[in-house]
């Protein structure tokens, strides 16, 4: 094939189509129905490489054009191409590992020569080498609410701090209610707590910083054991920082977007969040609320069981789950298994909201997923289990499958997932690398792309493999902000024709080698797939969260 491309000067997208189709043509079963597949009496769909060699040997421009047009036309049927890639993976080379390493090295050369590494290193840098994986599946917002005792603030049992947050521990027996964190009458008392914590603990025992206290968290004494573990404290307080950003944006332009993203509340004012968090819910023979239940009932040793399950709250507010079910789920301390628990309730599809999708693709911000497999022990999802127009994404600690409608939507969903969880350290034979390839393989092989979209996939691949390697000064590129990350990945310059061809060859071969390595099915799809339904206006449930 390379001889034909060189001899007849086939470049760009046409060359990429010829290379991809040539790799899988032997797996195609052609019916010869239209007879347009024959070139010199040979079916070019099934014997593409042989026909390319004959056309080159004969110097036949006419036959070469027919072959290129046939390859371009065949690639329009992406489902057939994907099936042929899967079939082609049955022929596993004994040198697959060596071939993968070779292709990674070739891609790294393009990464250097195209100036992509230099472009990445021009972004903001930081000194810390690791990050906490964050999403909107759980929250610490309930612990910003102020415990009360007979109309006055409850007595504080212990004090602590984490960075800019003061932490007050309370004896539950001294708490008979909780009120909103923005209650004006208690602002002076909260400021006094901040000053007291700063005076008692000028240096944070967790992070070592000596900054001002900007907010106070109110925790039950039973959480002191959980917070004593550094990893637990880091996970919980990162989410508290996310919630504090939400609180401080009340009344600002970004606040309605955050309300919709985190709680599925649309077109509402700031005070509505208290109706959701403090609204009455039936629980057995009495009433309670999300905030009250979180404070008064124990979780397990897993830090997630002490948080608010935001996904279930969004599902309830979208009308697909009874609000009371949130409390039953929290009572069972199963918060690490959102998706499986919803599946056990016969909800074969889960609903999620993501604001980046309508901004970047013009689609809806409500989308459906179906459960796939729990992501324990760095479980790598198997691309063979995907069906038409589907991609993988991870929700909390669970792999799910989402259906996309356009190539740009698929790139956006994959980029968001990779930004959250993938750490490209330059090593190719690691669990993180295989997770990256499971997501990228679908983009590279299945979706029909133009040069702009392939350039975005190339930058995304470079980030997933090399993007978090330290620079020459030992610092790390700051990829923490999703908006900045998406702009850098999606809005970069287009690759030149030569760069496009070179990187596509390497990415295509890496994708096919990954499919070969994942020949053994690692998981079973839990439920039969259902067609995605279009969601229109969100129907609000009553703010008191009571089920009618």
UniProtKB/Swiss-Prot annotation:
InterPro entries named in the record = Orbi_NS1 (IPR002630)
Q: Name one Pfam family in it.
A: Orbi_NS1
The organism's superkingdom is given as: Viruses
**What family, per the record?**
Belongs to the orbivirus non-structural protein NS1 family.
Q: What is this protein called?
A: Non-structural protein NS1
Per the UniProt record, the source organism is African horse sickness virus 9
Its organism's taxonomic lineage begins at: Viruses, Riboviria, Orthornavirae, Duplornaviricota, Resentoviricetes
Gene behind the chain: Segment-5
């Amino acid at each position: 094939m390379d001889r034909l491309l060189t001899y007849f000067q086939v470049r760009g997208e046409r060359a990429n189509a010829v290379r991809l189709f040539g790799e899988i043509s032997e797996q195609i079963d052609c019916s010869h129905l239209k007879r347009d597949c024959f070139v010199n009496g040979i079916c070019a769909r099934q014997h593409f490489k042989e026909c390319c060699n004959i056309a080159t040997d004969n110097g036949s421009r006419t036959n070469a054009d027919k072959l290129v047009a046939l390859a371009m036309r065949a690639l329009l049927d992406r489902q057939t191409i994907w099936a042929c890639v899967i079939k082609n993976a049955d022929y596993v080379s004994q040198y697959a590992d060596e071939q993968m390493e070779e292709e990674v090295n070739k891609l790294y050369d393009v990464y250097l020569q195209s100036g992509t590494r230099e472009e990445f290193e021009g972004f903001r840098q930081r000194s810390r080498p690791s990050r906490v994986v964050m999403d909107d599946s759980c929250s610490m917002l309930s612990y910003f609410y102020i415990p009360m005792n007979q109309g006055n603030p409850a007595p504080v049992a212990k004090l602590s701090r984490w960075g800019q947050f003061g932490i007050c521990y309370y004896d539950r027996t001294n708490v008979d209610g909780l009120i909103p964190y923005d209650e004006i009458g208690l602002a002076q008392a909260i400021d006094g707590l901040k000053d007291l914590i700063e005076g008692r603990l000028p240096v944070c025992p967790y992070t070592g910083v000596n900054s001002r206290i900007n907010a106070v968290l109110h925790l039950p004494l039973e959480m002191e054991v959980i917070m004593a573990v550094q990893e637990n404290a880091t996970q919980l307080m990162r989410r508290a920082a996310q919630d504090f950003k939400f609180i401080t944006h009340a009344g600002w332009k970004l606040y309605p977007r955050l309300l919709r993203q985190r709680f599925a509340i649309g077109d509402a004012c700031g005070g509505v969040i208290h109706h959701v968090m403090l609204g009455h819910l039936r629980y057995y023979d009495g009433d309670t609320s999300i905030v009250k239940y979180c404070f008064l009932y124990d979780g397990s040793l897993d830090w997630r069981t002490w948080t608010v399950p935001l996904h279930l709250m969004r599902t309830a507010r979208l009308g697909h789950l009874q609000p009371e079910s949130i409390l039953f789920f929290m009572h069972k301390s199963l918060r690490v298994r959102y998706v499986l628990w919803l599946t056990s309730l016969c909800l074969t599809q889960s609903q999620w909201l993501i604001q980046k999708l309508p901004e970047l693709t013009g689609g809806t911000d409500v989308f459906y997923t179906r459960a796939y497999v729990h992501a324990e022990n760095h479980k790598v999802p198997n691309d063979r289990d995907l069906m038409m127009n589907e991609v993988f994404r991870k929700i909390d600690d669970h792999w799910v499958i989402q259906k996309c409608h356009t190539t740009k939507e698929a790139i956006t969903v994959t980029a968001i997932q990779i930004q959250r969880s993938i750490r490209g350290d330059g090593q190719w034979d690691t669990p993180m690398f295989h997770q990256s390839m499971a997501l990228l393989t679908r983009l590279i092989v299945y979706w029909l792309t133009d040069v702009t979209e392939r350039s975005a996939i190339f930058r995304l691949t470079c980030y997933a493999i090399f993007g978090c390697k330290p620079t020459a000064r030992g610092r790390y590129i700051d990829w923490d902000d999703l908006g900045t990350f998406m702009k850098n990945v999606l809005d970069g310059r287009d690759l030149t024709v030569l760069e496009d061809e070179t990187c596509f060859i390497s990415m295509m071969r890496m994708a096919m080698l990954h499919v070969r390595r994942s020949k053994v099915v690692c998981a079973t799809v839990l439920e039969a797939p259902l067609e995605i339904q279009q969601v229109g206006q969100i129907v609000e449930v009553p703010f008191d969260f009571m089920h009618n």
